[in-house]
């Protein structure tokens, strides 16, 4: 059951902790809804302030009391009057001392007096429903919070300021203009005849704009969500040691027993400002062990969907049949051959053509790691390098743009075949509907649930 459906959204006053739980200097508690000021009057006291006539956007001092009149904490608080607030509703922010007991007692008091604990992302959801932001800006707020690199933060900030939203509005107005020309031709064809060539050129321009956005979307997505990288190789080649070396922490178990890693282990790192999500996978070999087979299957799936693979080889054994077996499985992927254990190897076998551009390292000592990082960056340069960006930062956004392009291409093809204008207008209207869903003009509760459930409770 979703308690946000129906009239509950407008009636309920919600409360939540907006800072991370735990011990800290200051904690922030948010209240939003039409009873925000009433709850403030019941719980916060300051003889010099009349809560009923509280000046908005001004920081005030006071004491927070529970429902029995017992003091909980000395606080500061700010009142934001509707609609000039984050949510578009009456809001109060309470700044209390950080600590689990203090914040819990304040929130418990507000709940007892009629507030409801906010759901994930409900403050931002209300901001959207009250017309303060569109869905793209709502997504950008979450991306700012989760940003792992300077580039991803900049993209998210650009979209919060309206970069992608403005481009979508341009597309929308262009399609409305084309639709108007078609409707004029249909309704007043005897008096006003808009040339089909003009309509066709307008649609081609829209499709070209969309094509560019979609073409460069991968770059925005990689910057926003991170570049994926997998370590593959035969058992006991040093994959877990390399993962720990790259992450500068012990995330994976390191032993001399082949096949120790059976599940995919993931970590995150930055190399010169580029955010990577790296996976350590099970050792790949021919085996009859059912459990190990499952791990190997997971390893291959993880590797093949990654942006770059580190193909780890053992410098002490040279290129083996097991290595050749793995090579044949990943040869069509973007991979970097990496010779490990150079600290204990006598020589490195670089005679094989596809290994001539390999990197030589010791995951144990750290030798060659700088060269490996440079090689990794070079292999994904096209995905993250500076240049044209589409500011498409989520798969949802990309999917909607592809749907719009599909409808515009249909309209263009129909126009070239001299199909009736009223048929062509259907495809254009479908494209407009997709743009409106992308921005949030049209939405379903399931769509909102999917987006805002990723937020923390206090946002």
Swiss-Prot record:
HAMAP family per record: GTPase_MnmE
Cofactor, free-text remark: Binds 1 potassium ion per subunit.
Cofactor section: K(+)
Coiled coil start-end: none
GO MF terms held by the record: GTP binding; GTPase activity; metal ion binding
Family membership noted in the UniProt record: Belongs to the TRAFAC class TrmE-Era-EngA-EngB-Septin-like GTPase superfamily. TrmE GTPase family.
Chain sites annotated for binding Mg(2+): 240, 261
Organism: Fervidobacterium nodosum (strain ATCC 35602 / DSM 5306 / Rt17-B1)
Protein residues bound to GTP: 236-241, 255-261, 280-283
Subcellular localization(s) per the UniProt record: Cytoplasm
Binding, (6S)-5-formyl-5,6,7,8-tetrahydrofolate: 30, 93, 132, 459
GO biological process, one term: tRNA methylation
InterPro entries cross-referenced by the UniProt entry: G_TrmE, GTP-bd, GTP-bd_TrmE_N, GTPase_MnmE, MnmE_dom2, MnmE_helical, P-loop_NTPase, Small_GTP-bd
Pfam families per record: MMR_HSR1, MnmE_helical, TrmE_N
Enzyme class, first EC level, given as a word: hydrolase
Disulphide connectivity of cysteines: none
PANTHER family from the UniProt entry: TRNA MODIFICATION GTPASE GTPBP3, TRNA MODIFICATION GTPASE GTPBP3, MITOCHONDRIAL
Record: residues binding K(+): 236, 255, 257, 260
Keyword entries, A-Z: Cytoplasm, GTP-binding, Hydrolase, Magnesium, Metal-binding, Nucleotide-binding, Potassium, tRNA processing
Protein name (Swiss-Prot/TrEMBL): tRNA modification GTPase MnmE
Biological role: Exhibits a very high intrinsic GTPase hydrolysis rate. Involved in the addition of a carboxymethylaminomethyl (cmnm) group at the wobble position (U34) of certain tRNAs, forming tRNA-cmnm(5)s(2)U34.
Subunit details: Homodimer. Heterotetramer of two MnmE and two MnmG subunits.
Residue span(s) of domain TrmE-type G: 226-381
A cellular component annotation (GO) from this entry: cytosol
């Amino acid at each position: 059951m979703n308690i946000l459906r129906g009239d509950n959204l407008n009636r309920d006053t919600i409360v939540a902790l907006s800072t991370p739980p735990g011990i800290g200097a200051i904690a922030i508690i948010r209240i939003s809804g039409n009873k925000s000021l009433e709850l403030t009057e019941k719980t916060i006291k300051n003889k010099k302030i009349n809560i009923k006539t509280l000046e908005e956007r001004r920081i005030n001092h006071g004491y927070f009391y529970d429902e029995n009149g017992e003091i909980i904490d000395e606080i500061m608080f700010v009142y934001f009057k509707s609609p000039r607030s984050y949510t578009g509703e009456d809001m109060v922010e309470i700044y209390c001392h950080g600590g689990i007991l203090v914040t819990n007692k304040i929130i418990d008091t507000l709940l007892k007096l009629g507030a409801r604990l906010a759901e994930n992302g409900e403050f931002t959801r209300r901001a959207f429903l009250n017309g303060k932001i569109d869905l793209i800006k709502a997504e950008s707020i979450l991306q700012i919070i989760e940003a792992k690199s300077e580039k991803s933060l900049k993209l998210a900030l650009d979209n919060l300021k309206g970069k992608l939203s403005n481009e979508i509005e341009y597309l929308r107005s262009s399609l409305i203009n084309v639709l108007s020309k078609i409707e004029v031709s249909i309704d007043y064809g005897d008096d006003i005849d808009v040339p089909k060539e003009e309509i066709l050129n307008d649609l081609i321009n829209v499709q070209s704009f969309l094509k560019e956005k979609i073409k460069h979307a991968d770059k925005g997505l990689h910057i926003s969500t991170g570049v994926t990288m997998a370590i593959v190789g035969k058992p006991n080649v040093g994959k877990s040691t390399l993962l720990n070396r790259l992450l500068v922490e012990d995330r994976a178990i390191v032993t001399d027993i082949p096949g120790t890693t059976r599940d995919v282990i993931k970590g995150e790192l930055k190399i010169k400002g580029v955010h990577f999500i790296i996976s350590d996978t099970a050792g790949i070999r021919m085996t009859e062990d059912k459990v190990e087979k499952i791990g190997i299957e997971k390893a291959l799936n993880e590797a093949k969907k990654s942006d770059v693979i580190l193909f780890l080889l053992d410098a002490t054994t040279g290129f083996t049949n097991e290595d050749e077996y793995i090579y044949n499985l990943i040869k069509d992927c973007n991979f970097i051959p990496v010779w490990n254990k150079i600290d204990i190897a006598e020589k490195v076998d670089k005679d094989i053509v596809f290994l001539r551009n390999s990197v030589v390292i010791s995951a144990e000592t750290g030798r060659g790691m700088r060269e490996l990082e440079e090689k990794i960056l070079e292999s994904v340069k096209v995905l993250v390098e500076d240049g044209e960006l589409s500011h498409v930062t989520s798969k949802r956004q990309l999917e909607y743009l592809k749907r719009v392009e599909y409808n515009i291409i249909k309209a263009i093809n129909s126009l070239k075949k001299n199909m009736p204008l009223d048929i062509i207008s259907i495809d254009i209207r479908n494209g407009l509907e997709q743009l409106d869903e992308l921005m949030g003009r049209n939405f379903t509760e399931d769509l909102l649930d999917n987006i805002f459930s990723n937020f923390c409770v206090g946002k």
